[in-house]
């Protein structure tokens, strides 16, 4: 298909759908591995989330795939340790409803208000803090420290370096579809190195059944978890707009107009809330799959239906989930060194692309306070609720952007 022609369910496209799932697979399973969630549940919620998104945008379905969001790695990890999976999932449901609220406001007031309260001078540094806050966890995994201290430092560093090198080589020199799966290649290379060193335990795979129902977890709503999780949704909400622009450029179909952000954000939000209802990580649009669409010219959104169905089926393969649980921490740590840095650089790119002048005192103040308060570990505790990390940084940025006066020669966004 050389141009976008709308949704057309054809069984001959099923194999392409499986191929697209393969592209998303590495990043999809990485989030639950890092946050202590179930990888099989993540596969299931990615599948049903994508199908729900297609149902909501049925007037003009964009060819995109929804799966685990990297923006929520730090808050999910903290939430699981602090309140448990059930309460953290309550926060995920609420974060999805934040998307829904944004979609309703866009429906009522248009898209302009979104750029007013969330300009690049706020969004850029908030995205950067996500990567910076996560970086110590990656370093600890690479160095064999903390709870992951199951191997010698030499083993950890060697395996992490192999994983990292594989990702870099594929990103730099890969061609075609190979270039879209650097995470998967990094996991494969690191896993092979781990096998050579002899630190992989196959017991979980041997004892797992072929068919197994994922370990679903129902949400429990705890105010602290909800307050902590909702502000994190700001960054992926903006990322969603960027992905809609990207798929528009690839297909030459203006999805920002039809079905419009009011529908795509609604679909993304409800998919995230649905994921929280089952115990899965929040969903977001996957730019890797958009890249695959660009390379293959396979614009039919029904292909994503097959990718979603394949993800749901794989969620019930018990041995797959068990195999993913045997991946040693240094393998993941090596990949995370690069990915968390990339997240931070995406925030920097947001500032640069939009011409945010950091010599302007107003912008300098907003960026500086977001950084120091979010990364420095500041906590605002109001008893029943508290703000810290990325959520606190986002709150400070939004407040300062609305309160600080704009100069006549520069409006700040």
Q: Where is each model-derived feature located?
A:
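Short, non-helical or kinked segments that cap or interrupt transmembrane helices
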Residues: 37-43, 60-72, 114-123, 179-184, ...
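Interfacial segments of multi-pass membrane proteins
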Residues: 75-81, 171, 289-304, 310-315
């Amino acid at each position: 298909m050389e141009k976008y022609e709308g949704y057309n369910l054809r069984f001959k496209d099923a194999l392409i759908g499986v191929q697209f799932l393969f592209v998303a697979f590495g990043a999809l399973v990485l989030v639950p591995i890092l946050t202590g969630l179930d990888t099989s549940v993540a596969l299931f919620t990615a599948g049903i989330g994508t199908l729900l998104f297609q149902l909501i945008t049925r007037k003009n379905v964009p060819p995109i795939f929804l799966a685990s969001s990297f923006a929520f790695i730090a808050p999910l990890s903290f939430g699981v340790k602090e309140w448990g999976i059930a309460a953290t999932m309550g926060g995920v449901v609420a974060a999805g409803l934040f998307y829904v609220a944004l979609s309703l406001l866009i429906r009522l007031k248009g898209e302009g208000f979104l750029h007013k309260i969330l300009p690049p001078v706020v969004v850029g540094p908030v995205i950067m803090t996500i990567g910076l806050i996560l970086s110590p966890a990656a370093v600890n995994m690479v160095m064999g420290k903390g709870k992951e201290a199951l191997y010698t430092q030499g083993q950890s560093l060697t395996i992490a370096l192999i994983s990292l090198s594989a990702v870099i080589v594929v990103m730099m020199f890969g061609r075609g579809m190979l270039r879209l799966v650097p995470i998967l290649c990094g996991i494969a290379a690191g896993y092979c190195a781990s096998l050579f060193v002899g630190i992989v335990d196959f017991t979980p795979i041997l004892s797992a059944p072929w068919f197994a129902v994922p370990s679903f977890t129902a949400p429990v709503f705890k105010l602290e978890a909800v307050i902590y999780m909702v502000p994190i949704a700001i960054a992926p909400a903006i990322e969603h707009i960027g992905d809609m622009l990207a798929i528009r450029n690839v297909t030459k179909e203006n999805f920002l107009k039809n079905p419009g952000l009011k529908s795509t954000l609604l679909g993304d939000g409800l998919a995230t809330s649905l994921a929280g209802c089952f115990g899965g990580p929040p969903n977001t649009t996957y730019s890797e799959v958009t890249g695959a669409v660009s390379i293959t010219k396979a614009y039919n959104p029904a292909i994503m239906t097959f990718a979603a169905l394949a993800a749901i089926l794989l969620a019930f393969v018990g041995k797959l989930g068990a195999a993913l649980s045997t991946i040693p921490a240094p393998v993941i740590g090596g990949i995370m060194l690069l990915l968390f840095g990339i997240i931070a650089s995406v925030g920097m790119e947001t500032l640069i692309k939009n011409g945010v002048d950091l010599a302007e005192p107003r912008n300098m103040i907003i960026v500086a306070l977001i950084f120091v308060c979010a990364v420095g570990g500041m906590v605002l505790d109001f008893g029943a609720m508290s703000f810290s990390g990325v959520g606190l940084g986002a709150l400070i940025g939004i407040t300062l952007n609305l309160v600080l006066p704009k100069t006549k020669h520069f409006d700040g966004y």
